[in-house]
Design a protein with these regions (language model features):
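Active-site mouth loops of central-metabolism enzymes
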Residues: 1-11
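Short, contiguous strand/loop micro-motifs
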Residues: 4-5, 35-36, 141-143
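Catalytic domains of cell-wall/extracellular-matrix polysaccharide-remodeling enzymes
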Residues: 7, 15-82, 87-99, 108, ...
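Catalytic grooves of carbohydrate-active enzymes
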Residues: 24, 104-135, 139-142
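Conserved, mostly hydrophobic/aromatic
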Residues: 31, 117, 159
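Structural motif corresponding to alpha-helix initiation and N-cap regions
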Residues: 100-104, 152
Length: 178
């Protein structure tokens, strides 16, 4: 996508989407770009940063993520930008029968700081199966497994066992607005 994207057009489209959501009474808590769409070029990344700054919305950016791209991106950050420490998620090739032990390992690996855990909720029903036909994970079955795990007592137990404090993007956004 990035090789064909024009930063000004991406900016205009993103702003239109944010404004439309707010016009309908939706109060965004943060900005996230699907599959890192606005990380593709420095110009697109600058659009992402400016959107967050202009709307006083935290953006999904982490120290471990930015280290994987180019030093140029790091230099584009200001001291006022909120940068998470890390972003984690279940490996996409994890078989469902290993779900709980793999999440146990993932939760045990969380270090002090702010970590976003990416999850993919959904129901393994006809509608989602049709949308995800021939799609590798996260497909419909994957999304159902995430739903089942994160609504289970095992999830609550792992959070407590690993002394994890759950927070929301709303709380992070408050840091930008206060």
């Amino acid at each position: 996508m990035a090789e064909h994207a024009v930063a000004e057009e991406a900016d205009r489209e993103a702003r239109a989407q944010i404004e439309r959501a707010m016009a309908y009474g939706i109060e965004p808590t943060h900005l996230d770009v699907h599959n890192s769409a606005l990380w593709g070029t420095p110009a697109l990344f600058q659009v992402y940063l400016e959107l967050g700054r202009d709307y006083k919305l935290p953006i999904l950016i982490s120290s471990d993520g930015i280290a994987k791209v180019t030093p140029e991106y790091q230099s584009m950050l200001s001291e006022d930008d909120i940068v998470l420490d890390r972003v984690i998620m279940m490996a996409r090739d994890t078989p469902v029968e290993n779900w709980v032990p793999e999440y146990e390992k993932l939760f045990a690996s969380v270090e002090p700081g702010v970590t976003q855990l990416i999850i993919h909720f959904g129901f393994d029903d006809a509608e989602l199966r049709a949308m995800a036909v021939d799609r590798p994970n996260p497909n419909a079955a994957w999304r159902q497994s995430d739903f089942d795990f994160f609504t289970s007592a095992e999830f609550k137990s792992l959070v407590a066992k690993n002394d994890i404090q759950l927070i929301s993007w709303r709380e992070i956004r408050k840091l930008l607005r206060d």
